[in-house]
Amino acid sequence: GQRVVYLMINLNKKKDLRYFVSILEKISIETLKEFNIVSVSRNDRIGIWVTKSNNKYLKKEKKIGAIGIRIKKWISFHGISLNVKPDLNYFKQINACGIKNFEVTSLKELGIDIKMEEFDKVLLAKIKKYMVF
């Protein structure tokens, strides 16, 4: 149920971590948009947050994606994860990214039940489009 993408990118040509994180956010947000999910990133909370799905606003934003990177000698490690259809009960046992008072969601919980292959096709297209270094 959770799609995790580890990107090992040489950032030596463009040594700008904020730009790199913004690209990871854009890939996530644009992928979700293809499935009629409106999501955003927030300056005060790490991750990708759903505000609207299938033309319905959520009462409170829910986290659908995480971003975690490590940089060593300007080579990126780790990357993003997006919740397609995981068992959300496991998330009740943890404090995702150390953020309290917010729930975690998935495409499936939002009423979008797709095969991982379909999700992967869209995600890969967005990575190819935006990950230009």
Please annotate each region the language model reported.
Residues 1-2, 6-133:
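Catalytic beta-strand/loop module used to bind and position nucleotide/cofactor moieties
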